Structures are given as C-alpha cells and as structure tokens.
C-alpha cells in the first residue's frame, strides 16, 4: 500500500527500468533510484572462469511460461535447424534437486529458518551463475525471450536477438539500458 510505504521516514526503492520508475514516482514520495539489474555485477573474472569454447552454433533460449509472447520466430532466426539449439535455461528445464528438496522443508526452529537464505546465497545462486555462463558462452549468437539471458549475452559479447515478453518488461529494460548495445537487436 502506497500510504504505508510513504509513511516510512527513510525508504529507498530501486527500479531497473524507466517505466517502473515513472510508475513509482506517481505512487510514492520516497527515495527512488534507477539502477541496472544486479546481473550486470557478474565480474569479468567470473565470466572468464566459466566461459566455454565458442562453437559455430546459435542458441534460441525460449521461455516456456506465461511471459512468452508468441511471435513467428522463424522470421527472425537465420540459422538452419542443425545449427540451432532450442530450449530454456537448463535450471528451468530440470530443477536443481537440492533446491526443490529445501523448498519443501519446513524449518520450525528459529535458528534453522535462515538456512534456505544462506543456501541460496552461498550455493544455489553461484551454481546458477556458473551454469548460465557455461551454457550461453558456447554459442556464437543468442536469440532469447529471457531478460537475464540477454544481459548475460551482453556481458559475454554475443550477437543477440532479444524478443519482448508478454507484458513489455523486456522492451522497457531494453529502452532503459540496452538500446545502445551494437550487437543487440530488439524485436517487439
């Protein structure tokens, strides 16, 4: 509720695109900041550590949920089928078993309630970053409907075709942060 948020004396809210920032400006009177997505904080050292040898194949990383916006993707994909890997994030296609197990646990004792957060910070998030870099870095060109794949592809200096999602999140982020990236083409 905006009234509750506005009553806070020192509240700072970060938005990752100008559309979200404008919405917040109309609803709130707190400190608002426009900041890029945290994925841009992946260090060059981390990218170099997990980067794989690039092949001549292209990747079409296509989400399979309610955010997917249907396009005639064939109008934008130049590669032949044998030169194209089509799929979603490896961690989205096959959930990380330990995460699923921990998600089902109910921590009743106060001291144990932080275990899922500690696990996410120390194990699961670094695992996802590593897997993402290893996966995306193998391809010379990336077609994607996922924002974080586009960001990772920018960090890896890939040629990118970036498709909007069902409610314009990708377009808003592109217009705020990615429109000047030479190797990136956006499809609305």
Name each model-derived stretch.
Residues 1-188:
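Active-site anion-handling motifs in enzyme catalytic cores
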